[in-house]
Regions:
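Membrane/wall-proximal cationic-aromatic binding patches
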Residues: 26-121, 233, 237-257, 309, ...
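Conserved SGNH/GDSL esterase-like catalytic core that processes O-acyl groups on lipids
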Residues: 104-188
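Catalytic His-Asp segment of secreted/periplasmic serine-dependent ester chemistry enzymes
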Residues: 301-367
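Loop/turn elements at helix/coil->beta-strand transitions in domains of secreted/extracellular proteins
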Residues: 92-93, 124-126, 153-158, 283-290, ...
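Hydrophobic membrane-insertion alpha-helices, especially the h-region
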Residues: 6-22
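Short, amphipathic alpha-helical "lid/cap" segments that border enzyme active or binding sites
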Residues: 138, 142, 268, 272, ...
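Serine-dependent acyl-ester chemistry module
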Residues: 164-315, 325-333
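Structural beta-sheet core signal
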Residues: 97, 160, 291-293
Length: 367
């Protein structure tokens, strides 16, 4: 019994010492920083449009494996070049961008994103406002734009961007009886947060655990890639593994394999419902509509059987100007096209891919 008490006493002394040193010294050091534990206070929930950005923000945000971007928002919480006031009306024409993380600009400073490129190119004629935020989908598109129009903000032209992941994201949106979003606020317990934010021991254990989990996931992915490409496991390269990851992520791969999300039709139906509402809203307010379809690596590598055909048919029925950017990514060497135009291991465009999208928009839309 004495040994147990003695051991507990030593552990308590160790934890107290860890707590004191961590808060007085360690948490000010570079090694203490861990992106996963960063307080992304600028990304906020909303009962009106589910989630968005805080207004008047200027921060450096980690993204993906190793990228960091400067994220700046204006007075209405839209990503922008600088913190600035947005009036409800403007003497210039106003272009509204509607989309998800690809249009928000994943991983890059604003000048290298679709929004930034359009804003620079069209600055003499248009004020470009970018409403896009990661994990948006048609239900959020409608709710957010409806909110700002009701607030009195005017727009002349809108570009709606839709990709295959939007259909899956839409499936997970929930509404209450009044039509407001039900926000899932579950997450780590406050006690868990307290431990990893105040003790080097627990913070180190978390990082080791995350590292082991990442390695395990990579090895599993490599095994799947070896089977897909009929290669020996040890001959399967990092490039093979990342190519498999880019083309078989389930949020996009459903377009060529409907067994991945058997209820994808529900996502399509829900998306159509809210896109119909959005189109009516824009038309009722005399806002010109351009509807853009663009591929992920999955749709470049394999035939899109369910996503693009569905929306082409929908656009024709509703007399909507649909522009498909799928042809911009066609070619014989699909792997090379994907690696050349997307962030390695990811679904988002790199700078070259973004420039291809930008050039296509400038050529295909009458600004």
């Amino acid at each position: 019994m004495k040994k147990i008490i003695k051991t507990i006493s030593y552990l308590l002394i160790l934890l107290i010492a860890d707590f004191i040193v961590s808060n007085l010294y360690f948490n000010k050091k570079e090694f203490w920083k861990y992106d996963r534990l960063l307080d992304y206070y600028w990304r906020v929930s909303s009962n009106i449009y589910h989630h968005g950005f805080l207004e008047y923000v200027d921060v450096i945000e980690p993204w993906g494996f190793s990228l960091k971007k400067r994220l700046v928002t204006n007075s209405i919480g839209f990503r922008d070049f600088s913190i600035r006031e947005i009036s409800k009306e403007t003497k210039k024409k106003r272009l509204l961008l509607i989309g998800d993380s690809a249009i928000e600009g994943a991983g890059y400073d604003y000048e290298h994103t679709i929004g930034g490129l359009l804003q620079n190119h069209l600055s003499e004629k248009y004020e470009v406002l970018n409403s896009a935020v990661g994990s948006y989908s048609p239900g959020i598109y409608f709710k957010k734009i409806n909110h700002y129009i009701k607030e009195g903000y005017t727009f002349d032209k809108a570009i709606i961007f839709l990709d295959p992941s939007d259909i899956i994201d839409e499936m997970f949106l929930n509404f209450d009886e009044d039509g407001n979003f039900i926000i899932d606020k579950s997450g780590k317990s406050s006690f868990s947060n307290f431990l990893v934010n105040n003790f080097l021991i627990f913070r180190t254990l978390l990082r080791v655990s995350d590292g082991v989990e990442s390695l395990k996931n990579f090895l599993k992915l490599k095994y799947k890639a070896s089977k897909k490409f009929n290669k020996n496991y040890f001959d399967t390269t990092n490039e093979d593994t990342m190519y498999y990851r880019m083309t078989h992520i389930d949020r996009s791969a459903w377009t060529f394999d409907n067994t991945i999300f058997k209820n994808y039709k529900i996502g399509l139906q829900k998306s159509e419902k809210y896109l119909n509402k959005l189109i009516k809203l824009l038309r009722d307010n005399n806002i010109e509509i351009n509807f853009i379809l663009y591929p992920h690596p999955s749709q470049i590598a394999y035939e899109d059987l369910y996503h693009q055909p569905y929306w082409i048919n929908w656009a024709q029925k509703n007399n909507i100007n649909l522009i498909s950017l799928y042809p911009e990514f066609q070619g014989n060497n699909k792997r090379k096209i994907i690696f050349d135009t997307f962030i390695f291991g990811d679904l988002h465009w790199n700078k070259k891919g973004t420039k291809i999208i930008f050039d296509s928009l400038i050529n295909k839309i009458d600004f």
